[in-house]
Amino acid sequence: MKTLLLSLVVVTFVCLDLAHTRTCYSCTENICLQHEQCQDGQDVCYKRWNTTYLILTDVVRGCAKTCPTPIEEEEVYCCLKDNCN
């Protein structure tokens, strides 16, 4: 009986951990307080911005399956924890 109970606890823990959905900041402003629950398979939080000017411009934050590739004069920061972007 104890073995069955322990097995159920382990299975429940594993299933709950696999069902975790990443949460990332999602906005287009420098200061961001808006969160987004990422879709299944989107485990990367990212922040991309234009480096043409001295100040951060064209900042975009959100969820992705993989880290976005920066385009010309753009930088991208990616991370794998909730709201790390």
Curated annotation (Swiss-Prot):
Pfam families: Toxin_cobra-type (PF21947). Expressed by the venom gland. Residues 1-21 form the signal peptide. This is Toxin 3FTx-Lei1. GO terms for molecular function: toxin activity. Keywords: Disulfide bond, Secreted, Signal, Toxin. The keyword RNA-binding does not apply. SUPFAM superfamilies: Snake toxin-like. Its main location: secreted. It is found in: Secreted. The keyword Nucleotide-binding does not apply. It comes from the Eukaryota. Disulfide bonds join C24-C45, C27-C32, C38-C63, C67-C78, C79-C84. GO terms for cellular component: extracellular region. Belongs to the three-finger toxin family. Ancestral subfamily.
